[in-house]
């Protein structure tokens, strides 16, 4: 068989094995041939380090005797590759050979195994004897400890109270003949049996809970035979195993923006981030983070996101947050609004008609309408001799502001412009006409009912002039009795109108109270001319500095007839046992006064700041007017009965709500 055959060329391993095998068999000296020295020199120069296979091929080509060995060797190798399968092990040729070899070496193997067993038995006996010695010492120690504990128990038993012995007859009657112990040996035997039963029961219960202990391995051969192969998944080539072939970090802008958004939400939870980023897994997200962390400041992005969340939360309204509840004052306004919306069209028309009549009967100093005729209103005004100076002062202030508003209205229509000529009235963009029965015997509850029924809106038209005197007030000029306009505007402004009414009343009371110069004389005289008892209480308290003192309540009148009016002395006002006059007003309305006065002042100042240069002369005068009389232009003034009745109604509603809750 030649080496150039395709069968040999397909098996290069055969040539290598054959070279190793034949080099050991063939002689080291090469046979004499027809090779020239020149050829050998040229061969060595071309291949300076020939391999064994090349040497072997040269030798086989020159020697004809080695061809037979080559053919035989190759035949043996190919014969081994053809595996023959047998059902029984005895059918294989190597089985009989191994059996003969075992029979020949059997005695030697048995002697070695017998010697190992003998050594192992001696070791076991030595360990058992040692264990018995240790066990005996341990049992002696346990017995000694038990005796000491029994001695301690007997000492403690003697110190305790003596045990009361019972009669032996009853005890013996419970025993039967079979329970009687005849001797001490039987007694000890019974005790031993009981102890044995207890031990067996305890051993059975413990054996069910304790794991089985395997036998000890005493010989080295057993250790080797029970060797556990822990080379499962063994890493032989560490650099190749732990090498991470990084793929190019190719991310488009959309993927990067999604990655940044998810990183702000989830942080370094790259598993969740990879779910949102299309076409990327968690490993790629981790790699992208560490490659871009120098160029993109992820920590700053997370910090800015948390800051913006906090700011947005602070800017939310209380109604949006849902944390702050409405005050009781606003709840009252909602109730009044619901009652007003349910009014019928007929009642609304009646209110407009009543408003046209009462608009001519407004009082000049408190700007509140009256149901009485013009003569009775003039008489009440003439009775205020002590307040004429304050009336003139208010008139001058309003006249100055009205002149400025008229000039402003000529340039652009302004619904808040004012004109005052000869005790004229303040005309607001949203004027509230309140129908109140201001009589000497008037009570707060009746007044509140009239407030709820007669509150409406007066809207001046744009085509009409803004300078309107008291003599030219007409319903068709000032009011547009359209039901659609009235109902739509009423829903939006009903609550603010009630607050404005109460706030303007407080403002006027404060101005009138501070204008009284001789409080002592009025108090000693018994009452103020033209004022009822509740009005006097409010005026006295306001004159002392905006309700710093306790004031008495309005006395009840008997059913038989009116009781004489009490005199309000300064000693009674200073009494701490009296209620404040502001309790009838409720603190919520006093807060409304402060809020409305500040808003009106700031709004007025803002309007003045953007005016033209020609109106700058009026700015200082208007600002001083606002400080002196805060709500003279913002809202119309209501009567004191309106204020007191509203306060009493608030107290009643609060008590009813508390009972319901």
Swiss-Prot record:
Residues 42-52 have a biased composition (Polar residues). Residues 308-328 have a biased composition (Basic residues). GO terms for molecular function: DNA binding. Signal peptide: none annotated. CDD domains: SANT. Pfam families: Myb_DNA-binding. This is Uncharacterized protein C22E12.19. It comes from Schizosaccharomyces pombe (strain 972 / ATCC 24843) (Fission yeast).
